[in-house]
Design a protein with these regions (language model features):
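Hydrophobic transmembrane alpha-helices
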Residues: 2-14, 18-21, 36-70, 120-156, ...
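Juxtamembrane helix-capping/reentrant segments at transmembrane boundaries
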Residues: 24-38, 85-107, 167-174
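Long, charge-rich intrinsically disordered scaffolds of nucleic-acid metabolism proteins
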Residues: 78-79, 87-93, 106-130, 134, ...
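Membrane-interface module
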Residues: 69, 73-76, 101-112, 190-192
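C-terminal ends of transmembrane helices
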Residues: 14-24, 75-81
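A basic- and aromatic-enriched beta-loop-alpha substructure that forms the phosphate/nucleotide-
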Residues: 58-98
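Membrane-interface loop-to-helix entry segments
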Residues: 101-116, 176-186
Length: 266
């Protein structure tokens, strides 16, 4: 079943959090993104405590994972921007000029819809009053692993960049894959999707969950592509970087996709 009133609540909360994007449009997709996921998780927990949704350990773990994932991600991005002047410069160069207000308004609404869709796998389980299942627990395990991987990758990157600001991170997780943090995000949403596979009751729910998953995977690959483009502009003539990039998968470990841009291998 669909509970449009509750989806409307989640949408309104997401729009509220994403208002920060009117200051810098990139915030719609960064700080607003994480905090939207976090606040939707909190809303689900509160509504469950009010008796609106079934209460179970598995459900509350998923609410907690939404909060941890979103709060950690946006908190990390916010602190990095405040403390790191080099990152602020890179962010300014990457975003370029501010966009017109009507474009911001469209992005605001679109991102609000997207973030509700991304979390809809858990919402549909609540709406359908589905029992806990093996699928849900497998999804929880995948999502938890994704959060841990992303957090460790961010920490390792910060440590390595502090030691070598003139080079990309290449050690530890970065020996296995060049964008382990993006891979962690894909894993997190893979877990959310897997957890919902046995509780969806109509075509609309299936379409919403699958399209949201495709969108986030596309966004992660696009993010990796843009990151690689910036790295190529900065380190493209550095043999150490090119050797590393030519032999290390860009976003999925063991998958031999090394570049998402046209590259002349030297």
């Amino acid at each position: 079943m669909w509970n449009w009133a509750h989806l409307g609540i989640f949408f309104a909360l997401s729009l509220l959090v994403c208002l920060c994007g009117f200051k810098k449009y990139v915030y719609f997709m960064s700080i607003g993104y994480g905090f939207s996921v976090a606040i939707i998780g909190v809303a689900m927990a509160v509504m469950s405590l009010m008796g609106i949704y079934p209460m179970s350990i598995a459900n509350f773990i998923q609410f907690a994972l939404f909060f941890i994932y979103g709060f950690r991600l946006s908190g990390f991005l916010l602190i990095r921007e405040i403390k790191n002047a080099a990152y602020r410069k890179t962010l300014a160069e990457a975003t370029g000029k501010e966009v017109p207000i009507f474009v911001k308004f469209f992005m605001w609404v679109f991102m609000g819809v997207l973030y509700v869709a991304q979390t809809s796998g858990v919402a549909f389980r609540l709406f359908n009053k589905a029992d806990n299942s093996v699928c849900q627990w497998i999804g929880i395990a995948i999502s938890a692993f994704g959060i841990i991987l992303e957090a460790v990758a961010d920490k390792q990157k910060s440590e390595q960049k502090a030691k070598r600001p003139d080079m990309v991170a290449t050690e530890q997780l970065y020996k296995i894959v060049r964008c382990p943090n993006y891979f962690g995000e894909i894993l997190f949403w893979t877990g959310v999707t897997v957890s919902a596979l046995d509780c969806l009751v109509d075509v609309g729910q299936w379409i919403t969950v699958i399209l949201a998953y495709i969108c986030i995977v596309f966004i992660m690959f696009n993010g990796a592509q843009r990151l690689e483009k910036r790295q190529m502009a900065r380190y493209g003539n550095d043999k150490e970087y090119t050797d590393y990039a030519n032999k290390t998968p860009i976003i999925i470990p063991l998958l031999p996709i090394y570049h998402l841009n046209n590259v002349d291998k030297k």
